[in-house]
């Protein structure tokens, strides 16, 4: 009878050699490595290699046909190479058992960098776009770290066909499936992914698990693993988890509020003890940049037709471009914190949803904020009243603009944005627009008539099974 795999270190590897030593130890039974990368929409793509191939793959990379992935590459330049990043190596916290007695194995996971055959970074790689943005922040603004913490909300349903809630719990009510949230966290912890807390969200069947703050690239990779683990654990319980932004009419949708701050040499650049909101000039300019470019980054942060069914009045989602401290109807909130917790100074961008391409969304929002610093963008006055209840005249007095009404408007604005074109690069910019226009055409063919904020049956059929 075959013995179970030995306990092992599952994360936090310093280099490729340490990964190889762990993988090739026969007692660990790590037989396969999944190499993961995002497609143009941020969905996880992966393929597995046998452990015996890992040494050569670290050295040479692995070739693949990029034209097989929709919107990823032009067919005349389809040959690409992916090189695994050893810093991202983790071991899945379970053991696979096949029908044969000897079929017992573990799997590892690594994110990969996509290269051209000449060894240059591939312009269509979303992960590279975020890396390039972070390099720009270091080079032009002397910012050595952007820390962020997204709040990814999700629904749990009985299956992937009908958005039928499995409970009637509300915000912080116990509801059902607390054990699902706990198991997700236990497995994440075993992979070195820290969480802060979990709770039932406001809508029926809606949940949230908050991830501990990380540097931006690490967080984007972590969010990809998080979405995979949420769905896998739900399946293990005979349920279906979805990050679809708005699956149910008359209920709150799922957001991905992104808390963020800029750091230099271990110092939070957003903190100023003398400002009423404890925000430094850097923070105020950054916040103003996010507001100034809010409409331009919307298509990236809210990339689905269904995303705009969430961004409507009355469901705790932002519609108006304003900021405040306690104001949850605003586009940006500045969370309060206890005295002595100055490192927690941050801003919370409330518009993104968890079905975005998180690499591109991070790149877009960081570039917008940094543009505010570069341009010394003036910060409008805060708005602390409920904007949904403000009269039109008061909204005009505060010069409050609105986010795009729908994906079509968001794409029109994005297409004219030099900031987003430069951030994404020509290849991804054009590919993203083309992909989203096809989506709009399919929506129009299946949902005739004037655009409606109600979630259509078509959206449930089209989005629920894969978001």
Protein language model annotation of sequence segments:
Residues 1-467:
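Glycine-rich, acidic/polar active-site loops that bind/position phosphate-bearing ligands
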């Amino acid at each position: 009878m075959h013995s179970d795999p030995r306990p092992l270190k599952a994360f936090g590897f310093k280099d490729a050699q340490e990964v190889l030593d762990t993988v090739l130890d026969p007692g660990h039974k790590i037989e396969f490595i999944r190499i993961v990368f995002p497609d143009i929409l941020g969905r996880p793509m992966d393929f597995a290699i046998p452990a015996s191939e890992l040494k050569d793959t670290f050295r040479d990379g692995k070739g693949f046909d990029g034209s097989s992935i929709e919107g990823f590459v032009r067919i005349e330049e389809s040959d690409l190479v992916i090189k695994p990043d050893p810093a991202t190596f983790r071991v899945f916290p379970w053991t696979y058992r096949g029908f044969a007695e000897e079929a017992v194995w573990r799997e590892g996971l690594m994110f990969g960098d996509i290269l051209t055959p000449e060894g240059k970074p591939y312009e269509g790689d979303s992960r590279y776009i975020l890396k390039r943005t972070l390099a720009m922040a270091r080079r032009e603004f002397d910012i050595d770290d952007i820390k962020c913490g997204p709040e990814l909300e999700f629904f749990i349903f009985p299956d992937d066909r009908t958005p039928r809630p499995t409970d009637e719990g509300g915000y912080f009510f116990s509801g059902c499936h607390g054990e699902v949230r706990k198991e997700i966290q236990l497995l994440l912890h075993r992979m070195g992914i820290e969480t802060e807390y979990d709770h039932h969200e406001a809508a029926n069947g809606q949940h949230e698990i908050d991830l501990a703050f990380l540097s931006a690239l690490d967080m984007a990779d972590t969010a990809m693993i998080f979405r995979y683990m949420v769905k896998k654990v739900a399946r293990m319980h005979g349920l279906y988890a979805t990050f679809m932004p708005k699956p149910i009419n008359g209920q709150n949708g799922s957001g991905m509020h992104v808390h963020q701050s800029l750091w230099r040499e271990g110092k939070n650049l957003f903190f100023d003890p003398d400002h009423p909101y404890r925000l430094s000039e850097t923070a105020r300019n950054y916040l103003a940049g996010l507001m100034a470019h809010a409409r331009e980054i919307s298509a990236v942060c809210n990339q689905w037709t269904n995303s705009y069914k969430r961004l409507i009045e009355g469901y705790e989602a932002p519609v108006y471009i304003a900021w405040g401290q306690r104001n949850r109807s605003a586009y940006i909130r500045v969370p309060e914190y206890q005295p002595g917790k100055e490192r927690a100074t941050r801003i919370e961008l409330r518009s993104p949803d968890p079905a975005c391409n998180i690499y591109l969304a991070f790149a877009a929002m960081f570039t917008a904020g940094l543009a505010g610093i570069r341009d010394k963008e003036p910060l409008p006055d805060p708005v602390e009243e409920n904007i949904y209840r403000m009269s039109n005249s008061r909204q005009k007095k505060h010069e409050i603009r609105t986010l795009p009404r729908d994906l079509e408007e968001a794409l029109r604005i994005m297409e004219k944005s030099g900031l987003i074109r430069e951030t994404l690069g020509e290849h991804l910019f054009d590919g993203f627009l083309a992909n989203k226009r096809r989506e709009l055409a399919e929506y129009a063919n299946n949902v005739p008539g004037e655009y409606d904020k109600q979630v259509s049956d078509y959206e449930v059929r089209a989005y629920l099974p894969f978001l």
